C-alpha cells in the first residue's frame, strides 16, 4: 500500500509530466486561460489517461506480447487512445454541452496529447503490473490536472496585473510556467525514486 502512495506522490508531484518531463504542453498552454476550462480539461484528461493506461496495459499484455507484435506498440496505443478519447467526447457531449463547447478543439486534441501516449509507453518501459499501470496513469493525470488548474488560476490573476507590454501574452505565460516548474522542484527531496 505504501508503494502505491509513493507512486502517486512521485508521479503527480516529483516527476510531473508537464513541469518535469515537458509532456502535454499544448493543452497546458492552450486551455489554461480560464479556470473552468482548465478544470474540465483536467477531468477529461484524468479519465482518458486512467482508462488509456488500463487499456494499453491489457493490449500490450494480451495482444502485442503473445503475437510478438511489439513493433506496432506506438501505432496500436494511438488507436486505443483515440477510441478512449472518442468515448469521452461522446459522454461529455451528452452530459455537459456547456463543457463540450468550452473545451472545443482541445477535447479531440487529447488524442494527440503526448502525455497520454507517454504514460502508456512509460508504463510498459517501467514494467508496471496492472494495478501500478492504472495508478501511474491516474497519478500522472492528477499531476497534470493540478498543474493545469494552478496555472489557470495564475493566468487569471495575471490578467488583472499591470504587466509591461513586451511580456504580455505568451511571454508572461512561459515565465510563469518556468517559475511553477521551479516551485515543483521543491518536491524532489520528498521521495527517493
UniProtKB/Swiss-Prot annotation:
InterPro entries: Ion_transpt_RnfA/RsxA (IPR011293), NqrDE/RnfAE (IPR003667), NqrDE/RnfAE_oxidrdctase (IPR050133). It is found in: Cell inner membrane. One of its GO terms (cellular component) is plasma membrane. One of its GO terms (biological process) is electron transport chain. Keywords: Cell inner membrane, Cell membrane, Electron transport, Membrane, Translocase, Transmembrane, Transmembrane helix, Transport. It is an enzyme of class 7 (translocase). Its EC number is 7.-.-.-. The chain crosses the membrane at residues 5-25, 39-59, 72-92, 102-122, 134-154, 171-191. HAMAP family: RsxA_RnfA (MF_00459). NCBIfam families: PRK05151.1 (NF003481), rnfA (TIGR01943). Belongs to the NqrDE/RnfAE family. The complex is composed of six subunits: RnfA, RnfB, RnfC, RnfD, RnfE and RnfG. This is Ion-translocating oxidoreductase complex subunit A. The gene is rnfA.
Amino acid at each position: 500500500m505504501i508503494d502505491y502512495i509513493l507512486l502517486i506522490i512521485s508521479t503527480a508531484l516529483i516527476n510531473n509530466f508537464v513541469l518535469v518531463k515537458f509532456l502535454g504542453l499544448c493543452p497546458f498552454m492552450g486551455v489554461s486561460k480560464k479556470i473552468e476550462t482548465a478544470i474540465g480539461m483536467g477531468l477529461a484528461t484524468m479519465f482518458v489517461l486512467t482508462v488509456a493506461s488500463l487499456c494499453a496495459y491489457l493490449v500490450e499484455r494480451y495482444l502485442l506480447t503473445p503475437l510478438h507484435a511489439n513493433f506496432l506498440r506506438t501505432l496500436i496505443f494511438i488507436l486505443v487512445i483515440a477510441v478512449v478519447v472518442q468515448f469521452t467526447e461522446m459522454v461529455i457531449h451528452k452530459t455537459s454541452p456547456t463543457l463540450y463547447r468550452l473545451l472545443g478543439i482541445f477535447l479531440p486534441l487529447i488524442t494527440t496529447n503526448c502525455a497520454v501516449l507517454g504514460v502508456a509507453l512509460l508504463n510498459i518501459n517501467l514494467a508496471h503490473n496492472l494495478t501500478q499501470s492504472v495508478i501511474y496513469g491516474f497519478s500522472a493525470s492528477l499531476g497534470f490536472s493540478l498543474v493545469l488548474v494552478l496555472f489557470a488560476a495564475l493566468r487569471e490573476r495575471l490578467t488583472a496585473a499591470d504587466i509591461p507590454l513586451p511580456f504580455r501574452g505568451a511571454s508572461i505565460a512561459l515565465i510563469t510556467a518556468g517559475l511553477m516548474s521551479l516551485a515543483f522542484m521543491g518536491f524532489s527531496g520528498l521521495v527517493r525514486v
